[in-house]
């Protein structure tokens, strides 16, 4: 560092918010409102079929200490939508402070949302606090997946220091349907070789299907949980299906996630997943 280079904690922090509202107009799902500011963007690519696709993007290229990022999607009554992220999110060394990500989606009565963000990659000394909430109206449902990768195996990265807190929850009528907290820190990483933590694995994902018929999808989901290099299990109860996956690296995990999503959705993944 020299006189022309400010210390890391003095650098400007990234802030962004993107919000999309969909509504049914004359029998079709239409964009009713779009608001975006700072580093957060949202766009609706042209798709084949009646279900719109929303792609959220963090233009800052990654997250570091003090950054603030939020995405919000409102899916109107009787509407269906698919939402994802343009690419994997990366949390870099934090310096001072914690990066915060807030995802808040709402699905109106009888609606449906596929929330399919691409994986989050955590780097050494990263500090990230993320909260994802999906609020379901009466008769609404959703499919949600979250994947986390601890460093890049291809680059020989092994993490020993980070602070990651992740809370995912789905509610209906003010009551929790699913609550998934996850916390990883230096102590957890030091114990990560143990079977009770990660068993030496470095990529993990949780998939949740909530809605009518979710329990019926247990058999088809289990039938494809055979990707080499991935440990996975599925269970179904109380109107939801849960699939948990662990892998040595992000690539086999991504392939397994894509296969399960293919079975549950019955159609191709968003194009950004395929690029």
Swiss-Prot record:
InterPro entries linked to this entry:
UreD
**Major site of localization recorded for this protein:** cytoplasm
Q: Which Pfam families match?
A: UreD
**Which UniProt keyword terms apply here?**
Chaperone, Cytoplasm, Nickel insertion
* GO MF, one example: nickel cation binding
Instruction: Point out the coiled-coil segments of this chain.
Output: none
Q: Subcellular localization, per the record?
A: Cytoplasm
Which residue ranges traverse the bilayer?
Answer: none
- Give Gene Ontology CC terms: cytoplasm
Asked if the record carries the keyword Cytoplasm, the reply is: yes
Assembly behavior = UreD, UreF and UreG form a complex that acts as a GTP-hydrolysis-dependent molecular chaperone, activating the urease apoprotein by helping to assemble the nickel containing metallocenter of UreC. The UreE protein probably delivers the nickel.
Alphabetical list of PANTHER family matching this protein? UREASE ACCESSORY PROTEIN D (PTHR33643:SF1)
Which family does the entry's similarity section mention? Belongs to the UreD family.
Q: What does this protein do?
A: Required for maturation of urease via the functional incorporation of the urease nickel metallocenter.
What name does the UniProt record give this protein?
Urease accessory protein UreD
Organism listed in the record:
Cereibacter sphaeroides (strain ATCC 17025 / ATH 2.4.3)
Give the gene name. Answer: ureD
